[in-house]
Swiss-Prot record:
Omega-N-methylarginine: residues bearing it: 549, 569
Biased composition range(s): Basic and acidic residues: 29-38, 866-879, 1093-1116, 1435-1457, 1471-1488, 1611-1621, 1739-1757, 1932-1945
Quaternary organization: Interacts with CTNNA1. Interacts with GTP-bound ARF1 and probably ARF6.
Any single GO BP term: regulation of endocytosis
GO cellular component, one term: cytoplasmic vesicle membrane
Residues with PTM Phosphoserine: 42, 63, 454, 610, 619, 851, 856, 875, 918, 920, 948, 1093, 1109, 1412, 1426-1427, 1656, 1729, 1906
Modified-residue entries (Phosphothreonine), positions: 741, 1504, 1669, 1902
Name of the protein described by the UniProt record: Rho GTPase-activating protein 21
Gene (UniProt): Arhgap21
Stretches assigned to the Rho-GAP domain: 1141-1333
Xref: InterPro entries: PDZ (IPR001478), PDZ_6 (IPR041489), PDZ_sf (IPR036034), PH-like_dom_sf (IPR011993), PH_domain (IPR001849), Rho_GTPase_activation_prot (IPR008936), RhoGAP_dom (IPR000198)
Compositional bias ranges of the Low complexity kind: 347-358, 1377-1395, 1531-1556, 1569-1589, 1887-1896
UniProt keyword list: Cell junction, Cytoplasm, Cytoplasmic vesicle, Cytoskeleton, Golgi apparatus, GTPase activation, Isopeptide bond, Membrane, Methylation, Phosphoprotein, Ubl conjugation
Length: 1945
């Protein structure tokens, strides 16, 4: 609407006089300058400033410039309109005058005046329209030229300005002109984007005669506003008056083209809509404007400059928004305005026309093209000092002045336009619709166009314009440019609905006051421009339509001359309009299919664009527009915008057009019925239609395309003459024959203008216009008051627009006009043209149709198809049938869209005319009403519900038209109960119900959107209701037939399916409902039935499940969902259809033949309804339903009925999609590429990895590539809504990774080892979808963070290890769980077997996942609740875990450094023993947190560890922070794994709690587990490193021996009962976890305890160090993987397994990690400032190192409690078992190294603590007793223990030196209890025992630090370490959810 949208400086050019006004009447401007608006001049000749006189101001340039900014406010006609103009030329429309090309109405006005600036001093005011710059008229100049003139002016700038009140565009689009727009453009004029090509020169070429109705004095004011406005106004004034003058009319048209925006604005200015226009403009600018732009772009069929068109469209869209409202009142005005536009007054024309129109109506066709003295007055802009006066005198003033005034004017103008009759009412109606349309399409263009369309309907030309208007609506601005005459009308809609009104008014008014004039204008003007106006103007309108629609929908083009345009959503109507001769036109009005088709197309287009249809209806029914105008304008604008984009869609254009076509036909029919009285109603109906279209456009479009095409073709064929007339007013043509009737009169009036029909007819039209105006005003008032007279209007104005739950749906729906829907419903496309007459004939039906259409719009114009069948039910069904026949798949696809649901809502409201706002008003004439017992059989989700679910309710039922309203109270009639929105009985099936209920006198009502039971008091009452409802449902014969057939066929299918499914009846209703829902988009209870509602979806899901299976199976299904899912997946339907078939053999999607239809449908459905559905794709669907759907789909996709209830269950749909990919014989990532993908994913370099993946993806077969691209985009869309659906890319990757990235053969090894890769690949694909599927030249993706999370967290080495372990998949499930450990022992690096076993475990665990998790949770909960130790453990866990990790890491590092390969070997064996692996894991985790242990830093790698630990602190923490998310994410997908793992962990942790040693080993294993969570390899490596380095040679030997005994740790664990550590272990409590834990912990742990005590700081530190470095790296790499896996149960299991397995790989990793640990320690040293925790941790760790240095016995002494022994694994075999369980549990929590990161951070803290411990040793015991941090809990026992530890640590550090220190870190890495002094450890042990996870962890970590420090100072660290401990100790983690939560990175 505003140039701002497309113009670079729409709002302001900049501080430098940015002329932000639209150069609306460039040519007019010339006229304005030199000519009197009153004097007839060619548009170019007329000075836009012929108005009483522009004010001249002299500005002196200053350094600040001239002190004002300009705004170029442009109401652009769509490029399609411009093309229409060309078409007009081609069709002989006055030689295709350029003026006919809708030129953007623009106004360059002063946006701001800087106070104190030259402009301010000169008196320049905001809103002053620039008419001349330095004496040079701006008319015909581009904004940049104007700016250049200003900028190039000398020191003095002479500006001729027109007051704001005189600027039509500003007046009409006051809000848009000021509220919307781009920021001030402060650049050179040359840089100012030029608006879309404006045919200003063309305007001048327009015959002056028409434009000359120089009464454009007021237009002058407009021209002042709009540069061309003045001329336009002048001409418009004349044109308005001269609207009667046919020749001037062409000129006006030219001007109209120029002044399109102006006209639009004028219309708005003149008409009440201006206020709404402003509002709408604001709306439109935001949504509508862009929408217009979008639409124009989408429809940019004829958009010469898509961008410019969009700009114009946007600008016009803004204008039309207001314009729609304006149109409502200014509909008639618009017609005169159209004349004015033709006159060539661009700006002035709009406003003038609006004004003139009113005046024209009021005044006789005196001097200028005005119909009446008012017209004369209007014409005489000069007579008024201000446009305001002019308007005031003109009465359109109400509409022209302020928006409020215009709104008032709309009402008044409707009446006043009653003078105009057709014009104003039409315009009002059009404005309402138009506003929506213009809002959607091109603000002004659309609005004007709507007006024009209305007018065109009112008048033949107007009807043509109506179609163009529709086009305008579609591509509001551009279309006006297209036609000259038609364009004028279109411009009337677009640039000035005023113009359209003027044109129509001319036509309409001509019959009234200037019947002759109208003919003169339309006929006279068109007489000379008869072809031009009838043919030329109509073509022009068509062209306009085309541009508008072409831009938006290409509707105009479609309407104009070819079905292709119709396909574009405008061609058909355009051609009809263009070619409709007067002769043909009457036939059209007589239901000539050609004519009807033309109108229908136009309307379809309008409806497609919503406004267009509305416009059409509006023209026919003026009264409705007022009501519908406000409501529809806003909603329509919103929905129109959406619609417009939808319209841009391929099918939608055609569908919408077709639907609109039909709707228009139907509307025409109805309108004809109510020509005079229903003309306003028609407008209202049109508005509803528009609104409805908005609602249903999306669906309708798909359905419409084929039907629409047929309709267009037939229409075109039938109306070749119509093409000649080029009149979009096929409806009007009908009025030719039916001119006697008010609507026919209006039609005739339009026809007269177009076909040069006799003035008498025009007069007749005029009378209808007057009557219509009165009716329109009344109806507007009624509508505003929720009146019932124009149901369509009310609905369009309020309900339909409001009803669409989702804008997108509305947009889509809007695309399919109600009439188009009706047309579609109309079995005969050709009869679409005929149908409009029918529509006209049955105005009330039209209302319903409108409401119905709007609702139907969602279902691709199914309801709309049957215009007469206003209810969506019938028309929808019929349309559905037609669509099925014509575009079945497409339609179904559309129906699958959300729009369908909206359609339902709209449908519901359709019947009520204005169900929400004016249900009672609309249907005040209730056919029947009374109290009935009501019970819905089908929920909003389309699911059948039992009586208990939906009890009977007593409702006051009111049957109005096709709507059945249910009220809880008779007094609530105005407000239908929320649950019972109006039920559309159109084409409903009603019968006596015997089976649904035992009650008597119950009849069942089945509609397209609902199924319900009603119980009457007695049989007679029931039969009476049935009869009444049947009659109401058959109001539209055509629709009813189709709909009933559809319902019946659906019912039959449903019954058949139900018979097979046992739930026959319920399912049938549900199915029908679902069908209706899908097609219509909503149930009869649209509110409750939001397709996007997750709850509804879930309910629907449940219902659908019930549907698919007998209700008795519900419990079974629920209980057996997992088994069912497996069965479903196992059950592979015959590969005859969709599932189990190669991608290239699958039925292709309609949009992309390389994408399977099922994928397209499922994704679309999910995107439509499931984006906000929590857990979409995660929550499985009903297996029975999935299997059933698979079978059906395999039978044939052609039978897919997305409306079926089973398609309502998002979970089923999502599961269906997953099942499809799972069943693909050739995986999406093909078998031959699978290995490459896995390998690529493991690349170290993130960019290289991504590039390789991209290359591989692009190397996929085309079907696979396209499907993957589509699916990735879909998943990305889903992930983008992760805040609501909780499905982040990681979660989606977990869900889809194994499904997409797999091999045809189910290889457990691959499943296990490659799962992280699969997750990662899919996650990466989702995250970088845009990059992956762009051209090679695309910039590199941002992989730093992502790669760190995904690639780093999942290092290739880990994968390799997993692969190697995979070779050892022969392990039992329990072994599998342990196999990670044993495998790592065996293949020390081959994590594959562990993963294989893990995968097996996953299989088992998946079965027991829920149970395991549940058990795990209770255990975790129970364990933490041990005692104060529990609290300590909570903090100590974190702190101690970190500390112990730090020690372990340091020790591991030292050991790694010292032992290196030796440790590797040992670790290999140790890894065999779970203790070692656990230790390794702990150490690995600790390395991340190693910085804290000062001992370790003192020792071999103490510095390194410090640095690394510091780094780990920071890095690991972040990782941990990340990990928790991953873990959480993975928790869903990894539920099975985590469940089983956790279960085993619980077992082990239970045992672990018994023995501290077990805890220690568990801790280690946990660390390993954590590490291995996502990247199993990493975890295993960590474990190995940690174990080997951490464990002393003895321990290692023990581990080796144990490894020998149990070749696989898992075997040993299994034998020991420790399988819990592995994922399987958790799943398989069978393994004596206690035994395993005891043995491992006793043997290994004792050794470890000794070695750890000796080497806890040394060997363990070295191990930790060694493992730490790699573990850090790998962990970092693994984090994302871990997160992913953690999300996945399998991942958790894997991590658990890997944790166990990591023992052996840990050795290898120790070396690898050694550097990392060293780095970490260095980092720790550098970044020791982990916090006070680190300092205490280090000092404590030093003390603890001393303690560890002390002999184990000494340490045990220090820790006299049994827990200390347990920690060491000395005498706590039982605890060891428990500990093992806990370890396993914890490991599950830790999965994927979540805890590793935490532990690493803890280790960092521990280092710091150890260092501080050294210092602390110097502190007094009391000081030490004091908590180092507030987080630290002061425990006397802990303090004593720490003191002991400190003392022992000091001794140890002195005695053992670095070795003990290293040991201490190792100890830190190992369970703290093992390392902590005996005294402390017992305490810790107690805590651990009591809290298992919490206490154990805290004590475990406490030892590395002095007990005091660990417990006190380290408490913070422990709290931090608790997470790390939790990470390290899976069982502990399981034990303590807190720890788990903390643990996740």
């Amino acid at each position: 609407m505003m140039a701002t949208h497309w113009t670079g400086l729409p709002e302001e050019d900049g501080d430098k006089l940015k002329a932000c006004g639209a150069a609306s009447a460039c040519e007019v401007s010339k006229n304005k300058d030199g000519k009197d608006q009153g004097e007839p001049v060619s548009p170019s000749e007329d000075e836009p400033f012929s108005w009483p006189g522009p004010k001249t101001v002299m500005l002196k340039r200053t350094s600040q410039g001239f002190g004002f900014t300009l705004r170029h406010f442009i109401v652009y006609p769509p490029e399609s309109a411009i093309q229409f103009s060309y078409k007009d030329e081609e069709n002989g429309n006055r030689g295709g005058k350029q003026r006919n090309r809708l030129e953007p109405m623009d106004t360059i006005f002063v946006k701001q005046v800087k106070e104190g600036g030259p402009a301010f001093e000169a008196g320049l005011c905001t809103g002053d329209r620039i008419i001349k710059v330095n004496g040079e008229s701006v008319i015909g100049k581009t904004y940049s030229q104007v700016i250049a003139l200003i900028q190039n002016s000398d020191t003095t700038l002479e500006l001729s300005v027109m007051p704001k009140d005189e600027d039509i565009l500003q007046v009409a689009y006051s809000q848009d002109a000021y509220l919307k727009g781009n920021e001030a453009y402060s650049g050179n004029a040359r840089n100012i984007p030029e608006p879309p090509p404006v045919c200003y020169p063309w305007l001048p070429s327009t015959p002056s005669a028409t434009a000359q109705p120089v009464e454009t004095c007021p237009p002058d004011s407009l021209p002042n506003k709009q540069q061309t406005s003045a001329p336009v106004l002048t001409q418009p004034g004349r044109a308005y008056r001269m609207e009667i003058q046919v020749p001037p009319s062409p000129t006006d048209v030219a001007k109209s083209n120029t002044a399109v925006c102006v006209c639009n604005e004028s219309v708005r200015t003149v008409i009440v809509p201006s206020e709404k226009v402003v509002d709408l403009l604001a709306n439109r600018n935001n949504p509508s404007g862009p929408s217009h732009r979008t639409e124009e772009v989408r429809y940019g069929v004829n958009e010469q400059a898509s961008t410019k068109a969009a700009s114009r469209t946007t600008s016009p869209a803004s204008v039309p928004t207001a314009h729609l409202i304006h149109q409502t009142t200014g509909s008639r005005s618009l017609e005169p305005s159209g004349i004015l536009l033709k006159s060539g007054n661009y700006s002035g024309h709009s406003e003038g026309i609006s004004s003139s129109r009113s005046q024209a109506v009021d005044s006789p066709p005196v001097s200028v093209n005005h119909y009446s003295a008012n017209s004369h007055q209007h014409i005489d802009w000069k007579n008024y000092k201000t446009y305001k006066e002019y308007i005031d005198n003109r009465r359109l003033h109400i509409g022209c002045r302020t928006i409020q005034e215009r709104l008032d004017s709309l009402r008044a103008a409707s009446q006043s336009a009653a003078d105009y009759n057709q014009v104003v009412p039409t315009r009002t109606t059009l404005q309402v619709r138009r506003r929506s349309t213009s809002h959607d399409r091109v603000p002004q263009s659309v609005q004007i166009r709507q007006r024009s369309v209305s007018q065109e309907r009112l008048e033949d030309s107007v009807l043509m314009k109506y179609c163009p208007r529709s086009a305008s609506q579609g591509a509001l601005t551009s279309p006006p440019v297209s036609f000259n005459n038609h364009r004028t009308r279109s411009w009337d809609y677009i640039e000035g609905q005023t113009e359209a009104t003027a044109t129509v008014n001319s036509e309409s008014q001509i019959p009234d006051s200037n019947g002759e004039r109208k003919q003169t204008y339309k006929w006279s003007g068109f007489t000379e421009q008869d072809d031009r106006r009838g043919i030329h103007e109509r073509p022009r309108q068509q062209e306009m339509h085309k541009p508008f629609r072409g831009s938006n929908l290409t509707v105009a083009p479609v309407v104009n001359s070819d079905n292709r345009r119709l396909v574009g959503r405008g061609v058909g109507p355009v051609s009809q309009f263009k070619k409709i001769p007067p002769d043909l036109r009457p036939p059209h009005s007589n239901r000539n299919f050609p004519t009807t088709t033309g109108v229908s197309l136009q309307r379809g287009i309008a409806q497609d664009r919503s406004p267009l249809v509305k416009v059409r209806s509006n023209s026919l029914k003026v009264p409705p527009p007022p009501v519908s105008k406000p409501s529809f304008s806003q909603h329509s604008l919103a929905s129109m915008k959406d619609q417009r984009p939808v319209n841009h869609l391929h099918q939608h254009s055609v569908l919408s057009q077709q639907t609109q076509f039909r709707s228009e036909s139907t509307f025409e029919h109805q309108l004809e019925t109510e020509v005079s009285s229903c003309l306003p109603g028609t407008s209202a109906k049109t508005s509803p239609q528009l609104s409805e279209n908005l609602g249903t456009s999306d669906l309708e479009l798909p359905a419409i395309p084929r039907n629409g095409d047929i309709n267009l073709q037939e229409a075109e064929i039938q109306q070749p003459d119509v093409l000649d007339n080029k009149e979009s007013v096929i409806l009007r043509e009908k009025p030719q024959s039916g001119r006697q009737t008010p609507q026919p009169l209006r039609h005739q009036s339009y026809i007269l203008a177009v076909n040069d029909q006799e003035t008498g007819s025009d007069t007749t039209c005029w009378l209808p216009n007057d009557a219509r105006r009165e009716v329109h005003i009344k109806r507007m008032e009624e509508r505003k008051a929720s009146s019932t007279s124009p149901p369509g209007d009310s609905l369009a104005s309020i309900p339909f627009i409001d009803e669409p739950t989702s804008p997108s749906i509305d947009h889509e729906i809007a695309h399919i006009p109600a009439s188009a829907v009706i047309s579609a419903s109309t079995a005969h496309v050709p009869s679409i043209a005929t149908v409009p007459p029918s529509l006209t004939t049955s105005a009330p039906l039209i209302r319903r149709q409108l409401s119905h259409d709007q609702e139907s719009v969602g279902p691709p114009s199914l309801d709309g198809q049957h215009s007469s069948k206003t209810e969506r039910s019938k028309s929808y069904d019929e349309g559905l049938d037609d669509y099925r026949e014509d575009a079945k798949l497409s339609f179904k696809h559309v129906s699958s869209l959300k729009g369908i649901k909206i359609t339902d809502s709209q449908k519901s409201s359709e019947d009520s005319g204005s169900r929400k706002g004016s249900s009672s008003e609309v249907f005040s004439d209730a056919a029947r009403e009374g109290w009935l017992q009501f019970r819905p059989l089908v929920t909003d989700k389309g699911k059948r519900v039992g009586g208990s679910i939906r009890p009977w309710k007593q409702m006051y039922v009111v049957l109005r038209g096709h709507s059945l309203y249910l009220y809880k109270d008779r007094r609530e009639q105005t407000t239908p109960s929320e649950e019972e929105q109006p039920i559309s009985v159109n084409a409903c099936l009603i019968d006596i119900s015997y089976s649904e209920t035992k009650r008597r006198n119950v009849f069942r009502l089945t509609t397209s959107d609902c199924e319900c039971l009603f119980q009457a008091e007695d049989r007679d009452d029931m039969l009476s209701w049935i009869k009444t409802i049947q009659e109401s449902s058959n109001l539209n014969e055509e629709d009813t037939g189709v709909t009933n057939r559809d319902l019946i066929s659906r019912r039959i299918k449903e019954y058949n399916s139900l018979l097979s499914k046992t739930e026959q009846l319920p399912k049938t209703p549900r199915q029908s409902l679902s069908i209706r829902q899908t097609l219509l988009g909503a149930k009869s209870e649209p509110k409750t039935q939001s397709p996007h509602s997750p709850k509804e979806e879930s309910e629907r899901k449940l219902l659908s499940k019930d549907d698919t299976s007998p209700p008795k199976d519900k419990g079974t299904w629920r209980r057996g969902i997992p088994s069912i899912v497996r069965k479903t997946f196992e059950k592979k339907p015959a590969a005859t259809g969709t599932f189990g078939v190669r991608l290239d053999d699958c039925p292709p999607a309609h949009t992309n033949r390389y994408i399977p239809l099922i994928v397209d449908i499922c994704c679309k459905l999910v995107e439509e309804r499931g984006l906000e559905y929590t857990g979409i794709y995660r929550v499985p669907g009903n297996n029975a339903a999935i299997s059933s759907m698979q079978e059906e789909l395999n039978k044939g996709m052609a039978d897919i009925d997305i409306q079926d209830d089973k398609w309502r269950d998002l979970n089923v749909i999502s599961s269906l999609l997953k099942s499809f990919f799972r069943k693909l014989p050739e995986p999406l990532f093909t078998n031959d590429k699978y290995a490459d993908f896995i390998e690529a994913n493991r690349k170290e370099d993130p960019l290289d990895r991504l590039r390789t993946l991209k290359r591989l993806i692009h190397d996929l077969p085309e079907h696979h590539f396209e499907t993957l691209k589509f699916l990735s985009a879909h998943l990305k869309t889903v992930a983008e809504n992760s805040e609501k659906n909780k499905m982040e890319p990681r979660n989606l990757a977990i869900v889809f990774g194994p499904t997409l990235v797999r091999t045809s053969e189910d290889n457990m090894t691959h499943m296990v080892t490659h799962m992280p890769d699969q997750y990662k690949i899919v996650e990466t694909l989702i995250q970088h979808h845009d990059w992956f599927f762009t051209e090679e030249g695309a910039e590199e993706p941002l992989t730093a963070v992502q790669e760190e999370n995904t690639v780093d967290s999942q290092p290739v080495p880990n994968i390799d290890h997993l692969l190697t372990n995979i070779g050892r998949t022969g392990v039992l499930p329990g072994d599998v769980s342990d196999s990670a450990t044993s495998d790592s022992a065996k293949s020390k690096g081959s994590w594959g077997s562990g993963k294989d076993q893990y995968s097996r475990e996953l299989l088992v665990s998946s079965i027991f996942a829920a149970a395991s998790r549940k058990r795990k949770k209770p255990k975790e909960k129970a364990q933490p609740s041990s005692s104060e130790d529990e609290l300590d453990s909570v903090f100590f866990k974190k702190e101690n875990t970190e500390q112990s990790h730090s020690e372990i890491k340091e020790e591991s590092k030292r050991e790694s450094e010292t032992s290196g390969s030796k440790q590797r070997v040992v670790v290999a064996k140790e890894s065999n023993t779970k203790k070692d692996s656990g230790t390794t894991k702990e150490e690995k985790k600790i390395p991340w947190e190693e910085p804290p242990p000062p001992h370790s830093s003192k020792r071999n790698r103490s510095p390194t560890l410090s640095c690394r630990l510091a780094m780990l602190k920071e890095g690991p923490r972040s990782l941990l922070t990340q990990k928790p998310h991953c873990e959480e994410t993975g928790s869903d997908s990894g539920t099975l794994l985590s469940t089983s793992s956790q279960a085993s962990l619980l077992r082990s942790s239970t045992k672990k709690s018994t023995s501290p040693e077990t805890k220690h080993s568990e801790f280690l294993s946990i660390a390993g587990t954590t590490t291995s969570d996502y990247s199993t390899t990493s975890s295993t490596t960590y474990l190995t490193s940690l174990d080997s380095s951490r464990l002393s040679p003895e321990v290692q030997s023990v581990a080796e021996s144990k490894g020998d005994e149990a070749d696989d740790e898992r075997s040993e664990l299994v034998s020991e009962g420790r399988p819990v550590e592995t994922d399987s272990e958790s799943e398989f409590p069978v393994f004596p976890t206690t035994l395993t834990s005891d043995r491992l912990f006793r043997g290994k742990f004792q050794e470890v305890a000794r070695v750890s005590r000796r080497n806890s700081e040394g060997s363990e530190a070295s191990c930790t160090e060694g493992s730490l470095t790699p573990s850090l790296d790998s962990r970092r790499q693994q984090f994302s993987s871990h997160r992913l896996i953690e999300c996945d149960t399998l991942s958790r299991k894997k991590s658990a397994r890997f944790k166990s397995d990591s023992g052996s790989p840990g050795d290898t990793r120790t070396e690898k990690e050694t550097p990392a640990l060293a780095k970490m320690f260095d980092v720790m040293k550098k970044g020791k400032s982990t916090g006070s925790l680190l300092t205490p941790s280090r000092s404590e760790s030093e003390k603890q190192e001393a303690t560890w240095k002390t002999k184990i016995a000494d340490r045990l002494k220090l820790r006299p409690r049994a827990p200390a022994d347990d920690m060491f694994g000395v005498g706590n075999q039982k605890p060891t078992a428990e500990t093992a369980k806990r370890k396993n549990i914890k490991r599950r929590h830790t999965l994927g190294g979540h805890r590793d990161a935490t532990e690493i951070s803890v280790l960092s803290f521990w280092k710091a603590h150890e260092q501080s411990a050294d210092k602390e040793s110097e502190l007094s015991a009391v000081n030490r007793l004091k908590p180092k941090c507030s987080a630290q809990d002061l425990s006397i026992s802990d303090w004593l223990a720490r003191e002991r530890v400190r003392t022992s640590a000091s001794d140890l550090s002195r005695g053992e030196g670095l070795e003990p220190q290293a040991e201490s870190p190792s100890v830190l890495g190992t369970p703290i209890s093992t390392h902590s002094p005996p005294s402390q450890q017992p305490e810790a042990r107690v805590a651990a025992t009591s809290t298992l996870a919490s206490t154990s962890q805290s004590p475990l970590f406490t030892p590395p630090q002095s007990p005091d420090q660990i417990n006190r100072e380290s408490f913070q660290n422990m709290s931090q370490n608790a997470s790390s401990t939790a990470n390290i100790h899976p069982h502990k983690q399981s034990e303590s959810p807190d720890t788990k939560a903390e643990t996740p990175p």
